Amino acid sequence: MAEEIITETNRETATDHAYGGAQIQVLEGLEAVRKRPGMYIGSTGPSGLHHLVYEIVDNAIDEALAGYCTHIEVTIKPGNIIEVSDNGRGIPVDIQPKLGIPAVTVVYTVLHAGGKFGGEDSGYKVAGGLHGVGASVVNALSEWLTVRVRRDGAEYEQSFKRGKPDGDLKKIGAAASTGTTVTFKPDPEMFQETTLYRYETLLKRLREEAFLNAGVKITLTDERPDADRPQDEQSGEMRTETMCYEGGIRSFVSYLCERRDLTPLHPQVMYMKGEGQGAVAEVALQYYDNSYNELLLSFANNVHTPEGGTHEEGFKLALTRVLNEYGRAKGILKDKDENLSGPDAREGIIAVVSVKLQEAQFEGQTKAKLGNTFIKGLVNNVVYKALTEFFEENPAVAKAILEKATQAARARAAAKKARELVRRRSALESNRMPGKLADCHEKDPSKTELFIVEGDSAGGSAKMGRDSNIQAILPLWGKMLNVEKARADRIYGNDKLMPVVTALGTGIGDEFDISKVRYHKIFIMADADVDGSHICTLMLTFFFRYMRPLIDHGYVYVAQPPLFKLQKGQTVKYAYNDDEMKLLSAEMPGAKVNRYKGLGEMNPDQLWETTMNPDNRVIVQIKIEDAERADEAFSILMGEQVEPRRQFIEKNAKYANLDV
């Protein structure tokens, strides 16, 4: 049977497709990349800068998919120069028939030129991207780029400057091996925000590639001096890491579990694989006893699809169907019970879905969502058949998963009742807003701000100091709920979170509606100490787990109250950290320094001037650049196990600014 739970690694075999100059097709010329780089790499900020590396690595990965590459080496050199080397076949150097120039020159100078467009004459069966799109775009956005090819017993070299050839292709010597080495320097004219590469960002992506391509070895090395590194990655030492996972995506799921504070519900990671219509689908999953969340990562031709697509749809459909059918057949779900919903079936799951196919159809330039319709049926069939068989052969595991899902269903029903009770109560009350909410006069959400303030004392000062036209104040009281350890039904009974839910007006979880939000700026305002930071983290965990679109839309902020007040005569200045305090003390010798222990120590005028006045305040907008890392961080920080949290804090403490 093609779809089964297996323990041995299935390895792709090398294709016998020809790969020479005749296979390099030309679709259109390379134009406008430097004029509109965002169309090709998403942005010219840090994400676009790192995307250059991914494009070159993807070419090497495609060689691995075809069965010709086993080792990829990525090196960050001094000056933030990138070198990517592989032991694949080497880019063709013979003359491309249509243009009459070497194929490697075509690949690096012509947009949509490459050997990955499918068909019998293609150089590849499947590919993560269009061969020449990545190569030529990286070339266009580099100050300079050099490609060295080892092929047919010789080594060749071609150099480029800002996308244009800097001389002809040259044969520079003999070569005992095959492969391609690309070295490039991002153009600072294009990447004006930064040209500093982050080792950790590259490491995460390359580790994903290693998991998704079982047995392929990937090495990342950072040879830069600290002066060429981001400040928080300066260590004075060269860093290197080699990754190779024979277990493939099963190892990926295990790794994701190990990085979190989770206890597996069953010992074995389930793995299933199947083929159809020239595509291959792989799924690995495991449930966790102490998790109420789901983490589903999907990939198409090694490209992460954060917005999902047809492969995710097929997986979710099959998983829910199998659990319901098995539950009914075994009497775990009674006749009176409703079917499990999708979220019920996926509570506490970590799953990786990976498909590899010809002619992948991605929605959008950044390939965030897979659109091939037949993939839904393929993944659905693979998961349905394999999981049904697994449950029959492992009834104890199946029962444990069903019991967890039914508990989730009961909690969902309880949350629904609690939600309806809150609604009925609100409908009977003349004022539906929380009693302690001091609302603003303005009704246009795009102009209004909500300050969620810890404690009645600070809340009182904030109410007196605010601009009541646009600023609303909601003091929090009672015990804060850690939602990482609780299901949604407990939120509706929490006297600290429910006022927030009611004031915002959006609902939570599946019922969340961003169009109903009453404020477009939501500030968490807590004391600048350990307790305040804990409260802030609890609130951010709640927003991330149950009101995530607020963060995605850029509506959530953390207010930054000052730590110090310096006064000399009539001159008053505020410092927001120790370094600022030292600088101001040097500027104001003899100044009286007061250290604030809490927001309540400030009078209304001071709180307005330092923390709430749009003209003066220091704020931090909460952004999620990497949802997986955010999920991991919340799981570690707010979970039950102490050791992972201690390790996380020790690793990141030097970047924190806490009054301890």
Predicted regions and their residues:
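C-terminal interaction appendages of subunits in large macromolecular complexes
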Residues: R410-E429, D444-E449, G460, M464-R466, ...
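Short conserved segment of the HATPase_c
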Residues: I91-G114
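Flexible beta-alpha connector loops of hexameric P-loop NTPases
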Residues: Y40-G48, P92-K98, V303-T310, I375, ...
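Conserved short strand/loop->alpha-helix "switch" segment adjacent to the catalytic nucleotide/phosphoryl-transfer site
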Residues: K35-Y54, K125
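Residues immediately C-terminal
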Residues: D62-E63, G90-I91, V530-D531
